[in-house]
Amino acid sequence: MPLQSSFAKPVFSLEQQLGQKLILDFRYFCQHGASSKCRIPMTELPNELSTAIAKYDIGGVILFSENTQSIEQTITLNSQLQTAASRSSSKLPLFISIDQEGGRVARLPRDVATSFTGNMSIGATYKKHGTSFAT
């Protein structure tokens, strides 16, 4: 007997639901195989990855500093990623995230992107503000 929710009918297949739970790291991409020595930054979406995003209904990606060379290039890459997702059977957009922790870890150049305070400084406000910044 298949598992079913009594609250909502599933709209997507199990495979689509699993794909939506995946967030892939595309920091580097090498055309020929999975080499541990691959250090070619992925700054534009290769056809192989575009096909995989569409075929497997991937839910999201995480970008790193290697993926972001300029604002224009990052916009183009994001557009390529969303175009690939639009060709999936679910037609859902990707959740695009970036490894931007604040503080010393700043993947986006501070001169072209809004800089946010780090988690440590938010935590330091607990005594005065409690958990109001946690929501």
Can you describe what each PLM-predicted range is?
Residues 46-50:
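Short, charged beta->alpha transition segments
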Residues 12, 51-52:
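Short, flexible, glycine/charge-rich loop motifs used to bind or transfer phosphoryl groups or to couple energy/partner
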